[in-house]
Amino acid sequence: MGLADLHIHTIYSYDGTATVAAVLRRAKEIGLDVIAITDHDEIAGAQEAMTLASHYGIEVIPGCEITTAEGDLLAYYIKEKIKPGLSLVETLLRVRDQGGVAIAAHPMAGGMGMKSLKPYSILKALKHKSIRKTLIGIEAYNGTSIDRMSNRYAQLFANGIKLAHTGNSDAHVIDTIGFGATEFDGSTAADLMKSLLARTTRVRKMNEWSAFRVISSWGLRYIESSFARFSLARP
């Protein structure tokens, strides 16, 4: 059985706090087999992770959390950035054209600036036959969502429309990587993709913090990373 976390942010996200190397190191320490770096509307972090992955003994899937007009979408295996603010359908078409696949991020969740896709938008998109093979899953568990009931609603929704279930951390700090994870048969990224397409992935809830602890941890880490960025930017 393999274990993956397919929703992790780095300092390439405006609100991320961890370097790519730190993310890879932490993922290996906690026993993850596969991760995806999914920075907000940016693929540079994923590209860096792909370059460094072999040094840490972990597989990396290139990804991006794209801001669509209707909410956030996790895209995987894309090679170029996709313009934010497009409709969900147009975004999915562009993911498809790059040979990628997508998962709806934290559907129905709210709070902390989360821009979540609603069931109506997802169902509307799935009416388009040309993208049914692109939108393959629902993030049925988000490990750092402060809206706990949204995970339950997401699981019920995913069951109803028969898409793959993923559990992810949505980590913006190093401490929460792996708080949500996806179990799959096998251990490689190729095995994971087979499980996603076969709808056989399983959600694993690894850990959970209170909303206060999630927010306070992010705040402290963000201050630390901001000082580090400032120091690097100084001549």
Predicted regions and their residues:
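Charged catalytic cores and adjacent phosphate/nucleic-acid-binding surfaces used
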Residues: 1-6, 10-16, 20-26, 32, ...
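A short beta-strand/loop micro-motif in the catalytic core of glycosyltransferases
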Residues: 36
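Acidic/Gly/His-enriched mid-domain segments of enzyme catalytic cores or analogous surface patches
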Residues: 107-111
